[in-house]
Amino acid sequence: MGWLDRIHEDIGSVTQRDPAAQSALQVFLCSPGLHAVWAHQLHHWLWLCGWRLTARVLSQVVRFWTGVEIHPGAVLGRRLMIDHGMGVVIGETAIVGNDVTLYQGVTLGGTGSVSDNARSKRHPTLSDCVFVGNNANILGDITIGANSRVGAGSVVLRDVPPNSTVVGVPAHIVYRNGQRVLITDPHEVKDPLSDALIALADRVALLEACVGCAQPVPHTFTDEDEEREAYRRELDMLRDYVSMGGGI
C-alpha cells in the first residue's frame, strides 16, 4: 500500500472513530496524532535502512511539532489513531497492532529494570483494536490482548488477556468477554496498599486469638452477611461507573 493510500485510509478511520471530526480536510490539517504517525513511516524506514541518527533527529523535530514522541524503532500497525496526541510516548521496541486508539499522555515504555538492555524487547505489545485511555502507562515487555480497553490513569505491568477491561494502579481486570469480573478476594488485587491491609488484618486476627479472653474488636456491621452485602453494593456502583465509560 502506497503512502497516499495509507493517508486516505487513516483519514477515513479517524473520521469514523472521532465524533469531533467534521470533515476529511479538517482531519488532514488538524490532527497532530496523524501527523506524527505519518512522519513515523519515514523515520522507521530510515531506521531500518541504518540511517538511525537521521531518523532520531527527524523524530525529535516531529516531537516538538506534534507533542507526540514515537521512537523510529517502534512498529506501528495500520489505522492507529492518537487522539489529541500531546504527551504520548511510544518506546523503541513497542509493537502496536491495527485499529488501536491512544489518548493523550499514554506511555508505552520500559520498566527501567537493570535486566533491560539495548538488544532486548523492553516495551509492550498492543494487539489489534486496543483502546488506551488518557494518561495510562503500559510498561515492560507485556502484551495487551486484542479488543481490550485500558482505563484512564491506569498502570499496566502484567499481560492483559483479549476482550478485557483493566483499570487501577496497578491495573486489574474488571471486565472479561463482556462479563463483570468479581473481586471477592483482596489477594486478587496486587498492589502495596492491598498487601499492607491484608497483613494488618491478619495481624489483628492473630492478636485477638492470642489475647483469648479479651472481647474481639466490634465490627461496624451486625453480622457478616450485612458487611458482605455492603461491600457488594459498593462494588456494583464502581462496576456501573466503569461500564458507563467512567475512567476509560
Task: Locate the predicted segments by residue.
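Solvent-exposed, flexible loop/coil residues
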Residues: 32-33, 38-41, 74, 80, ...
